[in-house]
Regions:
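Non-catalytic accessory regions
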Residues: 1-73
Length: 73
């Protein structure tokens, strides 16, 4: 699965879990794409949301745990 699909899945799940809004997810993806184009860097959506104060590290880890559990099914 592509990296972008993984990022969208993370963001959608975080929104579904009530940690962020869909608007915050879309803005984080926009930041990610702009940085990738401008600087050739790729920051994870979770790190962008953390740095912008929209998620805590505990929330990020909770989302990642659920994603991992779903992958193992």
């Amino acid at each position: 699965m592509s990296e972008l699909n993984n990022e969208v899945r993370f963001g959608k799940l975080a929104a579904d879990m009530g940690f962020i809004t869909m608007d915050q997810m879309l803005k984080a993806i926009e930041v990610q794409v702009k940085e990738n184009i401008a600087f050739g860097t790729h920051r994870k959506i979770g790190m962008i949301l953390l740095e912008e104060g929209h998620m805590t590290m505990d929330q990020i880890n909770e989302v990642l745990k659920v994603l991992e559990e779903r992958r193992s099914l």
